[in-house]
UniProtKB/Swiss-Prot annotation:
Keyword presence, Transferase: yes
Name of the coding gene: glmS
Organism domain of life: Bacteria
HAMAP family registered for this protein in UniProt: GlmS
Active site feature: C2, K605
Protein's cellular compartments: Cytoplasm
Function, in words: Catalyzes the first step in hexosamine metabolism, converting fructose-6P into glucosamine-6P using glutamine as a nitrogen source.
Entry coiled-coil feature ranges: none
GO molecular function, one term: carbohydrate derivative binding
One Gene Ontology biological process: carbohydrate metabolic process
Record-given protein name: Glutamine--fructose-6-phosphate aminotransferase [isomerizing]
Domain SIS as annotated: residue spans: 286-426, 459-600
Keyword annotations from UniProtKB, A to Z: Aminotransferase, Cytoplasm, Glutamine amidotransferase, Repeat, Transferase
Domain Glutamine amidotransferase type-2 residues, every copy: 2-218
Length: 610
């Protein structure tokens, strides 16, 4: 959730650190800071509340010099957003930045106070700085002091330590919070996200759980949780250097909405032919594993959970395999029964979602036949720890509110469902061809849906002064309504809820009045007549209706019901298609309200803590 950047180089690194933080702004933060040391052990620490630009201005004014440094954007967990709670934190000559939550920080704080340490902040991170300073008094090196320190920490952390008396190195430790190391020529770097470093390197190594690494200009030495020197794979990144550029678009979210046709084409490339799904392209041993699956368990959070809920209908309707979907933060804390030959599927854009990662680790202990992930970030923890990974190819997603990651997850899930049904002989060649042809048609159809932008922008004015909104859908369009509701509340701060339309009479109907917009996702399908009855229930009570439907659905609008007529598309991919107008609606409502579309308040892009 926070952002970390570090560098050890011959050149001054302050500009590299600040630029790295700029590239991580999308993750969400409330304050930022840097600590830089030069070859004469002169340390400069600057922290600012607010945007990275305020930190950048202060760094420029101070003319910060030095070839070794660490930087951080903070998203408050312990202690209010303030300059004194901003990172880096210091203890004597030690400076520390940290992502995560130290669960035993209160116990450690009491211990350190008994040793005479005085705390200036309310954060859990400051205990790390004091512990390292204490251990360094007897340790042979900063590396040893950090190794001794992390053994005392409980919880999740990615932490980086700098000693002003040893400006040739920094030490980083990872447990539950991602850290990537970037390799340069005569200089090395680290960050919580490779995007921060794409302007200085393309060669990356991901630390694994329990790793501690010592980074100098010429070497990166990695040690595992037992203190043994280990080698980790170094890989070349193909991520775009200019991924952090909005180009012609006003916001990253708008850009990413428009990138969806290309993202879908990239995700499908090599995975489907003209008339079939290429099972082998889904993952190593996918064909063998899928042939044995009797049950699917999907675990995810947020938008990814909504994708899983949509896919549940597909697994059971198309592949004939039972499927459960659960929120990761609930799944990991309850006792559950593992069904025979169950496949666990985790969904995550970042591959670092803390609850989803913990759920994966728990499930692997509980006898699941196999664990796969559908993920957008190669080399992420979920990808490394799963038995096989089906990578979406959405490209870097900057906006906190997910768009192209969601639709590419849905496309990946539909391909997986088809492969599963195919391997088990549950779908015919004709059905497989129908699904694949619908997928091939989808990018062009989404391009057409984007042409409704101006109409939806005009529609958004009806919502901007409202305090509540309901979204309704049936079948696989209920989770699409859930996703639409999530988008609206995330970026416009309007309270929004989604309901299966059949639940209206069980409570939500009491909310209907002339100030309550009700958005209905209503393509023509076998549930349409049922849905029309629900629409009439809202009309009869004076509700404001906004119905997204194709011409075949046969809705007729009036002063209380606006019809947004969409082109007819295949029922197979309609759930993906109808996501697009919902995204545009949320975007334009937020734009009219003047909220921060790309970095909505209190939210972060990658939720790497509980």
């Amino acid at each position: 959730m926070c952002g970390i950047v570090g560098a050890v180089a011959q050149r001054d690194v302050a500009e590299i650190l600040v630029e790295g933080l700029r590239r991580l702004e999308y993750r969400g933060y409330d304050s930022a800071g840097v600590a830089v040391v030069d070859s004469q052990s002169n340390l400069t620490r600057i922290r600012r509340l607010g945007k990275v630009q305020e930190l950048a201005d202060a760094v420029d004014q101070a003319e910060v010099v030095g070839g070794t440094g660490i930087a951080h954007t903070r998203w408050a967990t312990h202690g209010e957003p303030s300059e004194i709670n901003a990172h880096p934190h210091q203890s004597g000559d030690i400076s520390v930045v940290h992502n995560g939550i130290i669960e035993n920080h209160e116990t450690l704080r009491e211990l350190l106070q008994s040793r005479g340490y005085v705390f200036e902040s309310q954060t859990d991170t400051e205990v790390i700085a004091h512990l390292v300073e204490w251990e360094l008094r007897t340790a042979a090196s900063l590396l040893e002091a950090v190794q001794k320190t992390v053994k005392q920490l409980e919880g999740a952390y990615g932490t980086v330590v700098l000693d002003r008396n040893d400006p040739s190195r920094i030490v980083v430790a990872r447990s539950g919070s991602p850290i990537v190391i970037g390799f340069g020529v005569g200089e090395n770097f680290l960050a919580s996200d490779q995007l921060a470093l794409l302007n200085v390197t393309r060669r990356f190594m991901y630390l694994e759980e329990g790793d501690v690494a010592e980074i100098t200009r010429r070497e990166v030495a990695v040690y595992d949780a037992l203190g043994e020197r280990v080698e980790r794979e170094i890989a070349e990144s193909n991520a775009e250097h200019d991924a952090g550029d909005k180009g012609q678009y006003r916001h990253f979210m708008q850009k990413e909405i428009y990138e969806q046709p290309t993202a879908l084409i990239n995700t499908m490339e090599g995975r489907i032919t003209a008339d079939s799904v290429v099972t082998e392209a889904i993952g190593v041993n996918a064909a063998e594993i899928l042939s044995k699956v009797e049950h699917v368990q999907i675990v995810a959070c947020g938008t990814s959970y909504n994708a899983g809920m949509t896919a549940r209908y597909w697994f059971e309707d198309i592949a004939g395999v039972s499927c459960d979907v659960e929120i990761a933060s609930e799944f990991r804390y309850r006792k559950f029964v593992t069904r025979p030959n169950s496949l666990l599927i985790t969904l995550s854009q970042s591959g670092e979602t803390a609850d989803t990662l913990a759920a994966l680790r728990l499930a692997k202990e509980k006898g699941y036949m196999a664990a796969m992930t559908i993920c957008n970030v190669a080399g992420s923890s979920l990808v490394r720890e799963s038995d096989f990974a089906f990578m979406t190819r959405a490209g870097v997603e900057i906006g906190v509110a997910s768009t192209k990651a969601f639709t590419t997850q849905l496309a990946a899930l539909l391909m997986l469902v088809t492969a599963l049904g195919k391997q088990q002989g549950r779908i015919s060649k004709e059905k497989e061809k129908e699904i694949v042809e619908a997928l091939h048609a989808l990018p062009k159809q989404i391009n057409a849906a984007l042409s409704f932008e101006k109409d939806i922008e005009a529609l958004a004015t009806d919502f901007a002064d409202k305090h509540h909104t309901l979204f309704l859908g049936r079948g696989e369009f209920y989770p699409i309504a859930m996703e639409a509701s999530l988008k609206l509340k995330e970026i416009s701060y309007i309270h929004a809820e989604a309901y299966a339309a059949g639940e209206l009479k069980h409570g939500p109907l009491a909310l209907i009045d002339a100030d309550m917009p009700v958005v209905v996702v209503a393509p023509s399908n076998d549930l349409l007549e049922k849905l029309k009855s629900n629409v009439e229930e809202v009309r009869a009570r004076g509700g404001l209706l906004y119905v997204f439907a194709d011409a075949d659905a046969g809705f007729e609008g009036d002063e209380t019901m606006k019809i947004i007529t969409m082109p007819h598309v295949s029922e197979i991919t309609a759930a993906i298609y109808y996501t697009i107008p919902m995204q545009l609606l949320s975007y334009y409502v937020a734009l009219i309200k003047g909220t921060d579309v790309d970095q909505p308040r209190n939210l972060a892009k990658a939720v790497t803590v509980e």
